[in-house]
């Protein structure tokens, strides 16, 4: 392969790959920070599965989904609208996974109402999601401008 073709291929995959790696790292950190207190509890869906297995699979699914969505959102010209949409989508996805972990590892073994599940998930997730979503979105936008 000649150098120009290698350079074109690398420049084509550099942005999506960077977005995917950052989303993977920040999502894994968020799941462990928010729901790490449930890592010693048994999963109701898979008695042999570790917390890491669940977190890793959720992170992989999130990385693929969010990478596609964030690449699509990168075509939006209004940076304010783009950042707001990225934050809302990221917060929604992370809260959803945190809720799934809470239900799987805590409330499935007890008698929580839906409202209580949401409130406890919010309690555990608020600080990690608030901090990491802002850091993630601004880091991604900063790096995307540089690429």
Task: Specify the residue positions occupied by each region the protein language model found.
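Aromatic-anchored segments of alpha-helical transmembrane domains
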Residues: 22-32, 88-101
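Alpha-helical transmembrane segments in multipass membrane proteins, preferentially the mid-helix core
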Residues: 61-76, 136-141
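Membrane-embedded alpha-helical segments of multi-pass membrane proteins
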Residues: 60-65, 127-131
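N-terminal signal-anchor transmembrane alpha-helix
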Residues: 2-54, 59-61
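Interfacial non-cytosolic loop connecting adjacent transmembrane helices
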Residues: 35-60, 96-126
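Loop-to-transmembrane helix junctions at the membrane interface
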Residues: 67-97
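Alpha-helical membrane-associated segments of multi-pass integral membrane proteins
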Residues: 12-19, 108-147
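Membrane-interfacial segments
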Residues: 33-38, 42, 76-81, 104-105, ...
């Amino acid at each position: 392969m000649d150098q120009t073709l290698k350079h074109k291929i690398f420049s084509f995959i550099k942005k999506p790959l960077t977005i995917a790696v950052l989303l993977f790292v920040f999502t894994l950190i968020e799941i462990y920070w928010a729901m790490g207190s449930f890592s010693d509890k048994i999963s109701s869906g898979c008695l042999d599965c570790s917390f890491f297995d669940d977190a890793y699979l959720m992170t992989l699914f999130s990385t693929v989904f969010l990478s596609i969505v964030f690449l699509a959102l990168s075509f939006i010209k209004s940076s304010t609208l783009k950042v707001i949409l990225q934050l809302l989508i990221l917060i929604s996805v992370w809260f959803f996974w945190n809720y799934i972990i809470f239900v799987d590892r805590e409330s499935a073994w007890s008698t929580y109402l839906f409202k209580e599940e949401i409130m406890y998930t919010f309690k555990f997730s608020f600080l990690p999601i608030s901090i990491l979503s802002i850091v993630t979105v601004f880091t991604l936008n900063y790096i995307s401008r540089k690429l």
